[in-house]
Amino acid sequence: MNPTVGALQATFGNAIGRASDMRDGWTSVTVTADRLRDVMTWLRDTPEHRYDYLVDVTAVEYRDRERPLEVVYQLRSLERKANLRVKVELDPRGELAVDSVTPLWAGADWLEREVYDMFGVVFAGHPDLRRILMWETYAEGYPLRKDFPLRGRFSRSEQVRQALNVNPEANYSMEELSIAEAYDELPGDMRERLRRGERGKVRDSE
């Protein structure tokens, strides 16, 4: 077992749940949502462990668990060449919220936005929590949740109408749009405003 697990249990007590070594070589440990920020800060800053690299943030939903939704953080200690998978269990029937780790690892920014967009998990303290794959006014819910219908909740024509009604200038920064293939297809005046850092207004729905 990764020695970090024993150190976590000694430091945080009941906030640390089940732990196991996985077949992929990673060690998995469950943490209560209310202590996540403390645990992650400890993992990053404690010299003996120092998980300095955040590999990924994602989520998984299971049907047969009391708290079926897990937010999963994959950490690596580059110095120690150790891997740790930290999991927080949440219940979709209650408040889907956990502290953001973006203040600890800036690379968590878009990863947490994707989990919010696809699963509806709110990351408290995130500097810019909004959808990243679906448009900002997307109203069908969270596409990777188990209760999301295969074909969506709206008709195909309504989905197309809503997508065409989106104003990308209002919802995305110059940085985001400039790396997208569709950027070259935007009107010239819109690209110029984006270069100046301006934002437009969301079009009114008809």
Q: Where are the model-predicted features located?
A:
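Terminal low-complexity/charged segments
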Residues: 1-206
